[in-house]
Swiss-Prot record:
InterPro entries: DNA/RNA_pol_sf (IPR043502). Residues 679-866 are annotated as: Thumb domain. This is Primer-independent DNA polymerase PolB. Residues 287-385 are annotated as: Palm1 domain.
Length: 866
């Protein structure tokens, strides 16, 4: 564009042109916007070659090259399943390991399918190609065009690779409820008709119950994953290829076969059991699909139950010169108006550790609520969103009520486990004796029953359309048809079978979809290379999610507070707790527990609301989600929660507990663990890298997390043991947690000496720091020495002029130095000018007491102000 033309345009728009000729000619750096996510629509749409569908499992074998920091590709293998269920395998070797010799994805498919045509196995080019791999992110980057061909990468893969979500950090939520996206690929225009196929990518890892590995999938199919014989190993597949080519090929091809056979089994499951003709991107999406179908099958409107309505808008399509109607669900105004309340009350599970160290020997039971969240969903009837009302009356929140409120509270000191959550940005939930909480109705009811004083500042009550208990009016329970169907189908299949595992996972997954997007989480968007917030799912419902989590927290809290006084609780984790109280002595007659039991009876008549998962005779309590077995009970499963620590690869799983026990008991200040982690998808995208691992040192963090105040320190089995009490308030809790984070940088809490050192550190920073005294790395007796010198030279704190004159500055300095304190003559002389703070000592540390005894021998009248 010339300057004149630019000036004309600028003038027409009302803006002054400021772009110079050199700037116009200068080459502009490219940005992400120069690489379109979806290519411009072609005016001519190619027609796919045929109605033939091929299902292809694929896998790659590679070795990491430390020089290039990339992978050397050894082979590409495929396993094609024909319409008659016949399987045909193929393996392709690149000419060498250089990156330029890699196959493009299109070439891979051509070399896989063309031989089938040439040999007459198929008679026409497939119009639909479904590609399956287990953890597709590891293999898809092995193709030459992974980064350069945006058409295949960012559109074709987005519906599947983007489905890595929670496990791998890519956002897929907006795609999760849609059909798997396909990308039309033209393989050869010269043929007649042209070879054109719709290609879809499916990651089988995302459709496995519990994120099973390929070996577990193979076991369910009766198609075991092959093992690599010694002396070969997975870390150097090149040696395996060179030493045993036949074994290498069998191993590699089996992985591709398992992926596609497993996916087809899931496809059959979806058609037969879920009555859907497609495979959703994840099991969570299956749960959503099944839930909405059960509502309709039972004449229940999803819109009425969820408080949504369909919003339509018209979108003008330029290329078609026509309007397109877009329909999206949206909250009804009455729900949208009050959504802030349940969103603020949605906290997740209660997770606390009540002891630290090696517990006393006893019989410890690990109890879980039976199907906690799935059962808890039955507590929800159909809400009457149009009649939501405000209430500040605590009594309105008692009984079978859906309500949410902002409250201030104080529990009696005698309550061992306060029940109102206080959320912190950095440390999760705390349950102090007093504070401010966003609480659900069940939690408010429990708090009142425990004697809490409470003021409701703002709150809402959401009435039920049919205001009766769910067990008296089962048809009004929103989730009853879904939960019953899950239970019936699980019972129909053999325990441990693929079908039974799928139904169990479907039942457990629905709750997570209700809560999706309620808390700010970011994920990497492969389409733009940027992080963005995860959107809600199609059934995200803050009222339901908050009520269920609050109900479960309240039930667990009621059970723990009803335990006999001689019972102890080691920890609580979401829906269960570790205690030394046998099942027959647990009081389950409270109103909330009784309500939960009645829901259990609906799902499984005669069942108990509590199930015992583990039993041990002695535990190690480290922190939240960190409990180990110190002494097992013969024939009983052990407790083993590692607090996020991943043992080294050479440690067998059966030895994990022993490894963790040794690691905890012998941990050192500042200790790090070497950990191999896969690079993130974001890093793969930005650096155009293969999926490679990175070794990094992770700081060991097994110290107590101070969600409770530690008390009663003692030594047990050679390690410090502490019990705990609830914090009085959040200011005290956060102050001590912050100070402990500082102290543990160079210390561990393993002995009574460590405990004394921590207490001294805490004393200095809570007592002396408030007096504007410079603490630094000093301990309490170091600071008291300085205060004593000031009192001595200024005749304060019980000291008089005769005491000051009893010894020279040099004699005082030498005396204190001989007692282990570094004091110079100058320190003594300068003390006369230093200010003595106005303070009173309500307590002293052991270090201070020892120093006071030393001082008393020379200055018996010296005393601290109280």
């Amino acid at each position: 564009m010339s300057n004149n033309l630019q000036d004309i345009l600028a003038a027409a728009s009302g803006y002054q042109s400021v772009t110079s000729e050199p700037a116009l000619n200068r080459k502009r750096p490219k940005t992400l916007d120069d690489y379109p996510v979806i290519p411009p629509a072609s005016k001519k749409v190619s027609v796919i070659s045929s109605d033939l569908t091929l299902h292809i499992g694929f896998d790659t074998e590679y070795v990491f090259n430390p020089e290039t920091r990339q992978n050397d590709i050894l082979s590409y293998q495929s396993y094609v399943v024909l319409p008659d269920n016949t399987g045909i395998s193929n393996i392709i070797y690149p000419p060498d390991s250089q990156k330029k010799s890699r196959l493009s994805f299109k070439d891979f498919l051509c070399q896989t399918i063309t031989p089938l045509l040439e040999t007459g196995v198929i008679t026409k080019w497939p119009g639909i190609i479904n590609i399956y791999a287990h953890f597709i992110r590891a293999d898809i980057a092995s193709f030459a065009n992974f980064w350069s061909d945006y058409k295949i990468l960012l559109k074709g893969i987005r519906g599947t690779v983007s489905s890595f979500k929670n496990r791998y950090g890519i956002d897929f939520d907006e795609q999760q409820e849609r059909r798997v996206k396909t990308e039309q690929i033209m393989f050869d225009k010269r043929t007649s008709p042209p070879r054109c196929s719709n290609v879809a990518f499916i990651d089988t890892l995302l459709i496995t119950p519990g994120g099973m590995g390929l070996a577990e999938c193979g076991e369910l199919l009766g198609l075991p994953k092959l093992t690599i014989p010694a002396p070969y190993s997975i870390t150097n597949m090149r040696e395996y290829l060179l030493g045993d080519r036949a074994g290498f090929e069998a191993y590699a091809l089996r992985d591709a076969e398992i992926a596609v056979r497993y996916a087809l089994q899931v496809r059959n499951f979806c058609a037969r059991e879920l009555m859907i003709d497609r495979v959703p991107a994840t099991i969570g999406a299956m749960a959503v699909s099944r839930f909405t179908k059960t509502l309709k099958e039972n004449n229940m409107s999803p819109e009425v139950c969820l408080g949504t309505h369909i919003k339509t808008r018209e979108l003008w399509l330029t290329e078609k010169q026509a309007f397109r109607t877009i329909k999206n669900p949206a909250s009804v105004p009455s729900r949208e108006l009050f959504e802030t309340f349940p969103i603020n009350c949605y906290h997740g599970g209660r997770n606390e550790c009540f002891m630290m160290g090696v517990t006393p020997s006893d019989h410890w039971y690990d109890y879980d609520l039976a199907g906690a969240y799935t059962t808890g969903l039955l507590d929800i009837l159909t809400p009457d969103y149009g009649n939501i009302r405000l209430s500040k009356n605590p009594d309105d929140y008692c009984g079978h009520v859906m309500g949410f409120a902002l409250v201030t509270f104080r529990f009696p000191e005698s309550v061992p486990y306060p029940s109102l959550p206080v959320r912190t940005d950095q440390y999760g939930l705390f349950f102090p004796l007093s504070g401010e909480s966003w609480a659900t109705a069940p939690e408010i009811e429990l708090a009142l029953s425990l004697g809490a004083e409470m003021t409701i500042h703002n709150g809402i009550i959401v009435p039920w359309i049919c205001d009766t208990s769910p067990h008296n009016s089962e048809s009004t329970s929103v989730f009853l048809p879904f939960v019953q169907q899950v239970r019936e189908n699980r019972n129909r299949h053999i325990k441990g079978s693929l079908e039974e595992k799928f139904w169990k996972e479907i039942g457990n997954s629905l709750y997570g979809k209700l809560a999706q997007g309620l808390r700010a989480k970011t994920a990497f968007d492969t389409a733009r290379g940027l992080n963005r917030s995860l959107p809600p799912s199609s059934v995200t419902q803050p009222f339901f999610a908050a009520h269920v989590t609050g109900f479960i927290r309240a039930v667990v809290g009621e059970l723990m507070n009803a335990l006999p006084s001689d019972s102890s609780v080691v920890s609580v984790t979401t829906d269960g707790f570790l205690t030394n109280c046998p099942l027959d002595k647990i009081n389950m007659s409270g109103p909330l527990s009784s309500r939960f039991q009645s829901l259990c009876d609906i799902v499984d008549p005669g069942s108990s609301m509590l199930t015992c998962k583990h039993e041990v005779s002695q535990l190690i309590a480290m922190k939240t989600r960190g409990q180990l077995t110190y002494k097992a009970i013969q024939g009983k499963p052990v407790v083993h929660a590692r607090a996020g620590v991943k043992p080294p690869a050479d440690i067998p799983r059966s030895d994990y507990n022993d490894y963790m026990v040794d690691l905890y008991l012998n941990r050192l200040p500042g200790q790090t663990l070497s950990r191999s982690t896969l690079i993130s998808t974001r890093e793969m995208w930005l650096s155009e890298s293969d999926l490679v691992s990175r070794e990094q040192d992770i700081r060991l963090n097994l110290e107590f997390d101070f969600k409770r105040q530690p008390v009663r320190p003692a030594m047990n089995e050679g390690h410090l043991l502490m019990f705990s009490r609830p914090w009085d308030n959040m200011e005290e809790a956060l102050q001590q947690r912050s100070l402990f984070d500082d102290w543990r940088q160079t210390h561990t809490l393993k002995t009574l000496a460590d405990w004394d050192d921590w207490c001294d550190f805490l004393y200095c920073r809570t007592v002396f720091s408030d007096m504007k005294l410079k603490v630094g790395s000093k301990r309490s007796d170091d600071i008291l020495v300085r205060l004593f010198l000031r009192a001595l030279t200024q005749c304060q704190w019980g000291l008089m002029l005769k005491d000051k004159k009893s010894y020279s500055c040099k004699e005082v300095a030498e005396w204190l130095t001989s007692e282990g304190y570094s004091v110079t003559v100058t320190d003594v002389k300068n003390a006369v000018r230093a200010k003595i703070p106005q303070m009173k000592f309500s307590s002293v540390t052991p270090r201070m007491k020892s120093l006071m005894d030393i001082i008393a021998r020379k200055y018996p009248t010296f005393c601290l102000p109280v």
